[in-house]
Amino acid sequence: MNLVPKSLHHLVRRPRLIIAGTIGTLLFLSLVNYQPMAFAGLIAFDIAAAIFLVLIGILTTRANTASMRHRARIQADNKWVVLLVSLSVAAVVIIALYSELHAAKDKSLGTIALASATILLAWLFVATMFAQQYAHDFYMAPGQLIFPGTEHPNYWDFTYFAVVLSMCCQTSDVAVTSTNMRRLVTLHSIVSFFFNVIIIAITVSVVAGAL
């Protein structure tokens, strides 16, 4: 008997995201009674994102082609739901960061450190979510991306592809060969463009406030 509703399958099959999200939520609920909501949210996100990235890092070093195919198969359902929810969380965090910086009359070292950590973690979180999705899509239908030198790319290869896209809003030496993958790359490029613009704006605000 399956006790898990079908609507939750796409989350249950992503234990690392569940673990990090649960810790972040509990931490936020604990902090919000003593700290401003924006500050509590930023601290909770930073810790949750750091945990998620560590867990994904461990997965990346241990995964092989067979395990990547298996993960792609069990996580194929509702991929857009998970991706869009993740992007929404990152967007809310950036809004909370702007609110916190705007409310702070003086940009102390602690405020600057919090802003820097949040920007870095949010950027890495988004890039990692896209990297995971590229890997899943590739191993559900191999050949959608062509990596020079290998027919069986690992998570590091997909992370490289996603990080370059996040930084430059364009592909590197990897060829995109399917319409499905082009849609995902297009979304990633658009998200990266606006994310990078916002990061520049926040950075200018922090530097100006610190002077």
Regions found by a protein language model. Name each.
Residues 90-111, 165-182:
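Alpha-helical transmembrane segments and their membrane-interface junctions
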Residues 52-65, 128-139:
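Membrane-water interface of transmembrane alpha-helices
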Residues 68-86:
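Juxtamembrane helix-capping/reentrant segments at transmembrane boundaries
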Residues 137-138, 143-178:
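Membrane-proximal soluble regions of multi-pass membrane proteins
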